[in-house]
Swiss-Prot record:
Coiled coil: none
Matches recorded under InterPro entries: COX7C/Cox8 (IPR004202), COX7C/Cox8_sf (IPR036636)
Major subcellular location class: mitochondrion
Alphabetized Gene3D superfamilies for the sequence: Cytochrome c oxidase subunit VIIc
Transit peptide segment: 1-17
Lineage, highest ranks first: Eukaryota, Fungi, Dikarya, Ascomycota, Taphrinomycotina
UniProt name for this protein: Cytochrome c oxidase polypeptide VIII, mitochondrial
Transmembrane segments: 39-59
Pfam families registered for this protein in UniProt: COX7C
Organism: Schizosaccharomyces pombe (strain 972 / ATCC 24843)
Known function: Component of the cytochrome c oxidase, the last enzyme in the mitochondrial electron transport chain which drives oxidative phosphorylation. The respiratory chain contains 3 multisubunit complexes succinate dehydrogenase (complex II, CII), ubiquinol-cytochrome c oxidoreductase (cytochrome b-c1 complex, complex III, CIII) and cytochrome c oxidase (complex IV, CIV), that cooperate to transfer electrons derived from NADH and succinate to molecular oxygen, creating an electrochemical gradient over the inner membrane that drives transmembrane transport and the ATP synthase.
Pathway(s) served: Energy metabolism; oxidative phosphorylation
Gene name of the record: cox8
Family recorded in the similarity comment: Belongs to the cytochrome c oxidase VIIc family.
Length: 66
């Protein structure tokens, strides 16, 4: 178990270092990030944002009606 977690951590560290070494120029950061992160993860975080924003919208609506 411990060995597996250490291997996973070293693999993550290697990925992080490799991505930081191939950093793009400041002008091309946005397309680089869009190409780097696949669309499903963006949709996943978008749905998370919607789910988190629903309670705030409901609270605002109720406060306006009171």
């Amino acid at each position: 178990m411990l060995r597996y977690s250490l291997q996973a951590r070293s693999a993550l560290r290697g990925v992080r270092f490799s991505s930081s070494h191939s950093a793009p120029k400041p002008g091309s950061t946005i397309p680089f990030y869009i190409n780097k992160k696949p669309l499903p993860t963006l949709l996943y975080f978008g749905t998370f944002g919607v789910i988190f924003s629903i309670p705030f919208i409901v609270v605002k609506y109720h406060n306006r009606n009171l």
